[in-house]
Amino acid sequence: MKDRAGCCLIVFILAMAVLFGIINDDKTDIITGLAVGIFLYASAPILVIIFIVLIIICILPDSTNQEPAMKLYIYDHCPFCVRARMIFGLRGLPVEIEVFANDDEAGPTALIGEKVVPILVKPDGTAMDESLDIVRFVDEYAGKERLDDTIRPEIQAWLDKVGKYSSRLTAPRCVQIGLPEFATESARAYYIKKKAAAYGDFAENIARTDEYLAQLHADLPELAALIYSEGHIGERLGYEDIITFPLLRNLTMVKGLQYPEQIRFYVERMAKQSGVPLYYDKAV
């Protein structure tokens, strides 16, 4: 029995020494571990148990502070990028986000072969684009209940209708609210030249804000009637949220916007759930 007790003493003391060295990543702490081991063993068994529990807690990985396994390249204003950002927040997954300058063609081209965002660099180091493909990949990667893939025709029809004029409200404003992709004059000039060709002169669109806002306010009740709850547009969290929230979020940069209560509650709740902030405080 004495031999067995002696062996246990030696094993325990050595274990304490090794654990101290591992935790502190310092060989000099092995001496401290030896001293602690001797003290605990000579004291009471309960102290030994408590110390072992504390050691286990210290060496277990902290799931709340996990390193991002993926990297997402975006523009802050881009609704397709918002789709990709949403799924990480909704699934509670960490992701490193990097914002390209709007006139940076080399960065995205080096990753995916063309100037496009969002771009996701996956855990294996390969890159992928297409916002909904990214959403599906991350949704599967999370290993939780999948998003509802139902998109009601009424939702799609509303998005198509409002999408015909909503960019005339948001495109001229996103270069005015201090977004990182427009930090340089060259990035702003690049965007203005490209988008003015698609949506018309920015100054003219700003001048017609009241007209476009009136049209939007007339269309919003139709969407409000389709919202099931504050937490999701459909019966449960799904792709209707992924394709609708980005447009509603971007419209919050328009000063004078008045959302019906159902939409306002939904937008604010989804911003918190997804971790994608709104633009109310920047509205112009």
Locations of regions flagged by a protein language model:
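Juxtamembrane interface helix immediately N-terminal to a transmembrane segment
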Residues: 1-14
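Short, mixed-charge aromatic SLiMs
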Residues: 38-41, 161-162, 265-281
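Interfacial non-cytosolic loop connecting adjacent transmembrane helices
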Residues: 25-41
